[in-house]
Amino acid sequence: MATPALISETEAWKDLKAHLEGIKRTHLRELMGDTERCQSMMVEFDNIFLDYSRQQASPDTINKLYKLAEAAHLKQKIDRMYNGDHINSTENRSVLHVALRAPRNSAICSDGKNVVPDVWNVLDKIKDFSERVRNGSWVGATGKELKDVIAVGIGGSFLGPLFVHTALQTDPEASKNARGRELRFLANVDPIDAARNISGLNPETTLVVVVSKTFTTAETMLNARTLREWISSALGVAAVAKHMVAVSTNLPLVEKFGIDPNNAFAFWDWVGGRYSVCSAVGVLPLSLQYGFAVVEKFLQGAHNIDQHFSSAPFEKNIPVLLGLLSVWNVSFLGYPARAILPYSQALEKLAPHIQQVSMESNGKGVSIDGLPLPFESGEIDFGEPGTNGQHSFYQLIHQGRVIPCDFIGVVKSQQPVYLKGEVVNNHDELMSNFFAQPDALAYGKTPEELKKENVSEHLIPHKTFTGNRPCLSILLPTLDAYRIGQLLAIYEHRVAVQGFVWGINSFDQWGVELGKSLATQVRKQLHASRVKGEPVEEGFNFSTKTLLTRYLQATTDVPADPSTLLPNI
């Protein structure tokens, strides 16, 4: 019998569809009353505790999801990824971000070559360079130590490293290592972002890390040229080689730019941008800020989850369980979004990073073979740390649209605070909300309960909570570099599981190309209008032509061939 072309054509998918109606009729109040069920939906690995008992699912649902995973050949697809097969078929590439955090003595191959030695050559180079910068043996053009770093990149070259940086800022070991140092990220081509990044910094003490694999990324290279001008106008052109380094494989363009190619740190085609935080893209700026030893612990944490993901049975495999539950919520229950709600301010940049990892990976409308998908796939990811989110969008989550939620809690705060006379300490106050919110979503509050509380009749509809809103809880013991690495890898692999089950390519991103190509046409028109005074004519629809003309008419003061003007803030 031929293998179905789409996962939705399998008996396992059809079985889940038939099972769906019974689950829809069962409220979480009833499901949560079954202690045995709840116990079966709790998993622990390396002191990370996952409780998914508040999902709209029975043990039978979970077993059917395992059968769906089997029908999708999930285990074989995971193995193919780890074996270096070209699972990114549209670009004919391996997908080996797991190799970036593999121990030195590991063997992970791409096209028959063990790539781990290459990874460690770069890591050793980063360790040596970052230690020389940090101990003052590598100095700037005027002999001053380089205490400030601006990492220039966009997308995966920015969001992942920013997440890890923000998470480490208040970790005791990391913050001690970073004392007197500053790390900033320049991503947006908007000149305001450049202005904010250089504000308060001295070119003499600043090192710029330019992150672009090809050294041709339009936004990144314009920002890099802006910072090159900032440095050279203050210190002279020769200073660029002392104040700028690159994460790139295009050494001729790196050298042409003015950066010593010996100060270029490589990464490879088998590393996708959104999965590159464990490469030089993230490791270099983070090591400059926190020291290589701290970043190495982060890599070890990610590797720990890599091993768990590749070896644990599905019923104990945290990324697999999370991925299967997401498929259930999106493709069967019809919930298009997911809220990522970390009850730790240190994780404030987790949701924006996972937003990219998830939505760029799985925001696809066709299968890996190019067939249109007859079911919903991909999630709209967003989030905010608790308790801030409670005073922002939780209203909708409780009484508006149903949005499955990930609650992430940490047992021990990075920065505990105790105040004499308070009922609970600050972290306990935070965690009180972490434990309460999932129950509020699951159970809700009925009109009958409100009547017993003597709530006015006219307010009862407004104060009723339907409940039956799915969520899950992840409890981490601490939030140090190792645990941050684990959390990152859990979410990376969760996204892969979803894509493997849906049968899509989670590792390309053709959807970003069309807008970029259209921007090229606009850029040419802006140049022609500024330099030659040409009106906006052919090639644009009426709406775009109107907007462009309005923009140009309002900016006639912009010189056609300006002298250099840098931000002044």
From Swiss-Prot:
Primary enzyme class: isomerase
GO biological process: gluconeogenesis; glucose 6-phosphate metabolic process; glycolytic process
A Pfam family hit: PGI
Subcellular location: Cytoplasm
Gene Ontology MF terms: carbohydrate derivative binding; glucose-6-phosphate isomerase activity; monosaccharide binding
Record EC number: 5.3.1.9
Major subcellular site: cytoplasm
Pathway the protein contributes to: Carbohydrate degradation; glycolysis; D-glyceraldehyde 3-phosphate and glycerone phosphate from D-glucose: step 2/4
GO CC annotations on file: cytosol
Cytoplasm recorded as keyword: yes
Catalysis performed (reactions): alpha-D-glucose 6-phosphate = beta-D-fructose 6-phosphate
Annotated active site: E360, H391, K516
Swiss-Prot/TrEMBL keywords: Cytoplasm, Gluconeogenesis, Glycolysis, Isomerase
InterPro entries xref list: G6P_Isomerase, G6P_Isomerase_C, Phosphoglucose_isomerase_CS, SIS_dom_sf, SIS_PGI_1, SIS_PGI_2
NCBIfam families recorded: PRK00179.1
Family: Belongs to the GPI family.
Subunit structure: Homodimer.
Protein name as catalogued: Glucose-6-phosphate isomerase, cytosolic 2A
Gene name as annotated: PGIC2-A
